[in-house]
Amino acid sequence: IDDSSGYFAALNIGKRSCTVDSDNLEQLICWADIVVHDLSPLMAAEKGIDAIRLFSLKPELVVLAITAFGSEGPEAEFRATDLILGAAGGWSMLCPATSSDPALPPLKVYGDQCYLMASISAAAVALATARDAADTGDGEFIDFSVQAYVASVLESALPTYTYKQEVATRRHERRLIPWKIFHAIDGPVFVACVEQ
């Protein structure tokens, strides 16, 4: 952590880290309950951590693959930044929610929100699956697509389209004030009042 960024340190505070020696990978797998990786299917196979190999070492293992677009389909080998995932998942089109200007291009939300939200949900899924695996002895491969997750949490965008066939737009009408982009002398500034 000494040579890492403040962002990395904040995300990993209180965690123990280790360096994996590929010669001892099998020992580590046999000790683990959950293996988490972010590799595409081909890369996972090249590194020897694809689900088939891991289950041959420990059938009750939970393998969580958090990838940009999932492990199947035409984008399975694609990598993506948070910017790409926000756009591919549809979130960028709703941002900023404070603007009703249709000419404003899609924008990225601050930080790595897509990856952070998806990671929290993926961790919950992995823990629930590990609990089940401990009871049944059956391991499971979890194919977690960040893009699919982002698309699933677009406020009411998905149900609105599903039931009304209406495409969601930026929702600039807010009851809490201020929640708006204000034009200051040196440029726009966004002010949000999320507490009453």
Give, region by region, the residue ranges found by the protein language model:
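Short, acidic/polar N-cap/turn motifs at the starts of alpha helices
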Residues: 7-8, 139-141, 178-181
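Substrate-binding/catalytic subdomain of NAD(P)-dependent oxidoreductase enzymes
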Residues: 129-169
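Alpha-helical interface/anchor segments and their boundary "cap" residues
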Residues: 161-196
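Short linear motifs in exposed loops
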Residues: 21, 96, 143-145, 192-193
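Glycine-rich beta-alpha junction loops
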Residues: 68-70, 146-152, 186, 194-196
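Short acidic/polar mixed-charge low-complexity motifs
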Residues: 16, 138, 187-189
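N-terminal helix-loop segment corresponding to the beta1-alpha1 unit
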Residues: 1-135, 162-166
